[in-house]
């Protein structure tokens, strides 16, 4: 049985969040939480929140034991990009792309 949590439209670049997601994929839930607590990346706080939600979904919706859960899948998809103008010299302008992410974490029971 698997439980899933998704955070959508998070205002951080998918590339930055993938660096954090790669650290926890396949790990046990408690180990993943410990890794996220000490990871000095901005995305680690958001990923920790999604992981906590996935564990809560597993406990509440499927009556699974949190100590027996593992991060079976974790991935980041690109959300819509906000395009903003940044003024430059001589009347020119550059486009600033403010990227968003959709973060998905799926937890399942350990296979013996």
Swiss-Prot record:
Signal peptide annotation: none
InterPro entries: Ribosomal_uL22 (IPR001063), Ribosomal_uL22_bac/chlpt-type (IPR005727), Ribosomal_uL22_bac/org-type (IPR047867), Ribosomal_uL22_CS (IPR018260), Ribosomal_uL22_sf (IPR036394)
GO biological process assignments: translation
GO MF annotations, alphabetized: rRNA binding; structural constituent of ribosome
Keyword annotations of the record: Ribonucleoprotein, Ribosomal protein, RNA-binding, rRNA-binding
Any one GO CC term of the record: cytosolic large ribosomal subunit
Pfam families reported in the protein's UniProt record: Ribosomal_L22
Family as reported in the entry's similarity comment: Belongs to the universal ribosomal protein uL22 family.
Quaternary structure (record): Part of the 50S ribosomal subunit.
HAMAP family hit by this protein: Ribosomal_uL22_B
Name of the protein in question: Large ribosomal subunit protein uL22
Organism from which the protein derives: Moorella thermoacetica (strain ATCC 39073 / JCM 9320)
